[in-house]
């Protein structure tokens, strides 16, 4: 089933998945391709050229195409592949993921990994503060309503690096603040892209019965108090002050139109954003993952 694999996009996650697929011991004769805009493939910019050369060095073929194309144009490309993995999520216009799923169905692709590397949208449910979540739930309905394309959704939680984004605010290295969202006991699952790539590649080449279902992986699952404790352990107690952004505070941020306020509110509720590591694919398969304590070893204070 995985003889001809197309990954959509070569951003942080796409590159991590491509590298893991290329290096997987069960790759055998599987052909790997990555969908990139022709302008990216033919770019003379040093960084772009370096990236293309790196991917080609791993035996990955650039496939010209653009996810902004029409459904039928995308289907014409997808028709040549057995497995498609969508890593085109961040910053894409509303409706892009629905169009990609429709193109996959139209092309008759055998297996699809949609861009759902994040929260468990079934658990969050419709009507949240984030409209894009409703689109993801509707895509799940589409997948479940058909039987021609096998699908797998890999729920990963938040990218671990997002904890350190200033707008998200959980670990602010510049202000030396750790924050809880909702309550200090609310939990969050976080995973680094490299580990997402490794586990996804393992599912692609060795599914072990995983099909037409949502699976979970986790680098770490912690409460915000546990996150703050690990930050203190790394940088010394008293270096960071603690601040709680409860639901009332986050609702004010939402009303003020603050950046990523919808996401913070979702994580503060704690539904569909955290799961026990014991029930994850990585634990079942004995795949070692990067936890927050280990990740923090490479994090330094902003001077």
Curated annotation (Swiss-Prot):
The keyword Oxidoreductase applies. CDD domains: PCBER_SDR_a. One of its GO terms (molecular function) is oxidoreductase activity. It is an enzyme of class 1 (oxidoreductase). Gene3D superfamilies: NAD(P)-binding Rossmann-like Domain, UDP-galactose 4-epimerase, domain 1. Induction: Expression is induced in response to 2-benzoxasolinone (BOA) exposure. InterPro entries: NAD(P)-bd_dom_sf, NmrA-like, NmrA/Isoflavone_reductase-like, PCBER-like. NADP(+) binds at residues 8-14, 36-39, 56-57, 77-79, 159-162. Its EC number is 1.-.-.-. Keywords: NADP, Oxidoreductase. NmrA-like family domain-containing oxidoreductase; part of the Fusarium detoxification of benzoxazolinone cluster 1 (FDB1) involved in the degradation of benzoxazolinones produced by the host plant. Maize, wheat, and rye produce the 2 benzoxazinone phytoanticipins 2,4-dihy-droxy-7-methoxy-1,4-benzoxazin-3-one (DIMBOA) and 2,4-dihydroxy-1,4-benzoxazin-3-one (DIBOA) that, due to their inherent instability once released, spontaneously degrade to the more stable corresponding benzoxazolinones, 6-methoxy-2-benzoxazolinone (MBOA) and 2-benzoxazolinone (BOA), respectively. Belongs to the NmrA-type oxidoreductase family. Fusarium verticillioides possesses 2 unlinked loci, FDB1 and FDB2, necessary for detoxification of antimicrobial compounds produced by maize, including 2-benzoxazolinone (BOA). The FDB2 cluster arose as a duplication of the FDB1 cluster with rearrangement and expansion by incorporating additional genes. This is NmrA-like family domain-containing oxidoreductase FVEG_08287.
